[in-house]
Amino acid sequence: MTERRIIHIDMDYFFAQVEMRDNPKLKGKPVIVGGKASSRGVVSTASYEARKYGVHSAMPMSQAHKLCPNGYFVTSNFGAYRETSAQIMSIFRSYTDKVEPMSLDEAYLDITELVRPDLPASKIAQYIRKDILEQTHLTASAGVSYNKFLAKLASGMNKPDGMTVIDYQNVHDILMTLDIGDFPGVGKASKKVMHDNGIFNGRDLYEKTEFELIRLFGKRGRGLYNKARGIDHSEVKSSRVRKSVGTERTFATDVNDDEEILRKVWELSGKTAERLNKLQKSAKTVTVKIKTYQFETLSKQMSLRDSVSSEEDIYNIAYLLYNDLKDPDVPIRLIGVTVGNLEQSTYKNMTIYDFI
């Protein structure tokens, strides 16, 4: 039986990072997302600069203001977060259909079928993080292991912008020394019960019998018993049927030079063709999307009689669509090429290994 390989990707301070990307003046500042300092809401996300003051998620905004009076308080922009999340999930699905999103900014990926001797799971995780950085200008942390529990644990161990691998060689040492509050799923209430019963770290948990843990925590006790031993048989659950494949790029500065933009369209067409070939699919619609310097999103789609899958065919259609969309007086900050209405190709295509 092939050993499973699971990646857990967790975006770093996602909401705050999106705000800092879209407003460079916020970069390096203590950014607190959730609302005005005077509001009755709670903190959604705080940048690492704000966390140094003790600000954290779910904290009342009023308390965050007391701790960090010079912080930059930003109202949540869920439209931008959802749009960026969709980009990130699309990147995940360009590698595998076995993707289980847990929220806008984190997901599990089962990449067991992609791993081979010269392409370990850690390298695939690096490629995914690189794609996220190039396409969204955001950093992500990754955990790699042989089950979901350990992959999630690993993703939080080297933040921000880091990666940790937990394997059979290091799992015991990591779990035994882990603070009980750092076990995924152990909240404040559970932590108090743990402490009241002499459980302060993974070793203490490991030394409890399954019966003792069930007595303390009910059905959850069996799960805690398994976690102390690094056991988790849960599957990566994905019910999504792929409907489209695409790639977007945000320019470092706003651009209105056709030659530069079309070079990017060619690059995106190639990336999209690679992903189609990996899936052994072809497409009957092509869409080009642009976002102007004023953050206005425009798109145009063409439906085709015959399906396409090659870089040249996708580019030729994208070229026509871009020319219909463009306004020479309006610089753009983002361009994307997406193909949809997918169908199975009638010939053997290349695989991911031809493109990595």
Swiss-Prot record:
Reactions the enzyme catalyzes: DNA(n) + a 2'-deoxyribonucleoside 5'-triphosphate = DNA(n+1) + diphosphate
The organism's taxonomic lineage, starting at the top: Bacteria, Bacillati, Bacillota, Bacilli, Bacillales
SUPFAM superfamilies (UniProt xref): DNA/RNA polymerases (SSF56672), Lesion bypass DNA polymerase (Y-family), little finger domain (SSF100879)
Role according to the record: Poorly processive, error-prone DNA polymerase involved in untargeted mutagenesis. Copies undamaged DNA at stalled replication forks, which arise in vivo from mismatched or misaligned primer ends. These misaligned primers can be extended by PolIV. Exhibits no 3'-5' exonuclease (proofreading) activity. May be involved in translesional synthesis, in conjunction with the beta clamp from PolIII.
Pfam families assigned: IMS (PF00817), IMS_C (PF11799)
Enzyme Commission number(s) from the entry: 2.7.7.7
Molecular-function GO terms, alphabetical: damaged DNA binding; DNA-directed DNA polymerase activity; magnesium ion binding
Protein name from the UniProt record: DNA polymerase IV
Originating species: Staphylococcus aureus (strain Newman)
Cellular component per GO, a single term: cytosol
Sites annotated Substrate discrimination: F15
Limits of the UmuC domain: 6-187
